[in-house]
């Protein structure tokens, strides 16, 4: 599904359209709709940990978010080898509005969300049997 970028992903301000593709319940891929790059691996944070933040009014207006908006929140994951050492950025969620096909990255204030890191290792959220430690 294609989305219009209303608040760009940091470092990719010129990208205006992105395509979201589901891999499975935990992972998705986000690709530039008009070029070969950038391509991001995204993760559903709610399947990994308790994750809650306030969406500022400016972002709500930009994405036209309402009380009943069909939205999805994902986080960018940096893939490493081995996969268990891959990291997740919980301080800059990507928000998708499925009702109007808009999206944007929100940068959270680290002092307001000290439990969230820029590069948290994904293995810290899994038990030894490879299942997430908690579900939302």
Swiss-Prot record:
Q: Give the primary localization class.
A: cytoplasm
Q: What domain of life?
A: Bacteria
Which is a GO BP term held by this UniProt record?
Answer: bacterial-type flagellum assembly
One Pfam assignment? FliW
What InterPro entries does this protein map onto?
Answer: Flagellar_assembly_factor_FliW, Flagellar_assmbl_FliW_dom_sf
Return the GO cellular component terms, semicolon-separated.
cytoplasm
Q: Where in the cell is it found?
A: Cytoplasm
Q: SUPFAM superfamilies from the xrefs?
A: BH3618-like
Membrane spanning residue stretches? none
Keywords (alphabetical) are: Bacterial flagellum biogenesis, Chaperone, Cytoplasm, Translation regulation
Q: How does it assemble?
A: Interacts with translational regulator CsrA and flagellin(s).
Q: What does this protein do?
A: Acts as an anti-CsrA protein, binds CsrA and prevents it from repressing translation of its target genes, one of which is flagellin. Binds to flagellin and participates in the assembly of the flagellum.
Q: Which family does it belong to?
A: Belongs to the FliW family.
Q: What is this protein called?
A: Flagellar assembly factor FliW 2
